[in-house]
Amino acid sequence: MGFTQQQEALVNSSWESFKQNPSYSVLFYTIILEKAPAAKGMFSFLKDSAGVVDSPKLQAHAEQVFGMVRDSAIQLQATGEVVLKNGSLGAIHIQKGVVDPHFVVVKEALLKTIKEASGDKWSEELSIAWEVAYDGLATAIKKAMS
């Protein structure tokens, strides 16, 4: 069964909740660094800081990550596959030293952040929708890395 309109709607509505509060971007990177402290150096806006500090670059990158997952949901619903809009995304991930376990860490951080942003609207269906959309994006990035 393909990605449904309902799943796309769930991702879209929770994406809006995420965007409304900049503290969710800080939470996202805090979770990543709790799970993979060595990943700090992969992010230019974090590598010289003592911890996760809110900044315009951090906000922009978090919105870009979550936005790409949202775009993946739209693509999955429309065509059943994710095609990267940024052709250099694979090369960027290779340059930063991203490997498979990093995708797992980011997925976990993304889901925990969306759970927090969604509050009482969080559900198993919402989690699955974000998981499937993220997995589609991760697969497309990994393909671009090979």
From Swiss-Prot:
Keywords: Cytoplasm, Heme, Iron, Metal-binding, Nitration, Nitrogen fixation, Nodulation, Nucleus, Oxygen transport, Phosphoprotein, Transport. The modification Nitrated tyrosine is found at residues 24, 29, 134. The keyword Nucleus applies. GO terms for biological process: nodulation; response to abscisic acid. The keyword Cytoplasm applies. Accumulates in root nodules after inoculation by bacteria of the genus Rhizobium. Gene3D superfamilies: Globins. It comes from the Eukaryota. SUPFAM superfamilies: Globin-like. Residues 2-146 form the Globin domain. It holds the Pfam family Globin. Nitrated in effective nodules and particularly in hypoxic conditions; this mechanism may play a protective role in the symbiosis by buffering toxic peroxynitrite NO(2)(-). Nitration level decrease during nodule senescence. Phosphorylation at Ser-44 disrupts the molecular environment of its porphyrin ring oxygen binding pocket, thus leading to a reduced oxygen consumption and to the delivery of oxygen O(2) to symbiosomes. Belongs to the plant globin family. Leghemoglobin that reversibly binds oxygen O(2) through a pentacoordinated heme iron. In root nodules, facilitates the diffusion of oxygen to the bacteroids while preventing the bacterial nitrogenase from being inactivated by buffering dioxygen, nitric oxide and carbon monoxide, and promoting the formation of reactive oxygen species (ROS, e.g. H(2)O(2)). This role is essential for symbiotic nitrogen fixation (SNF). This is Leghemoglobin 49.
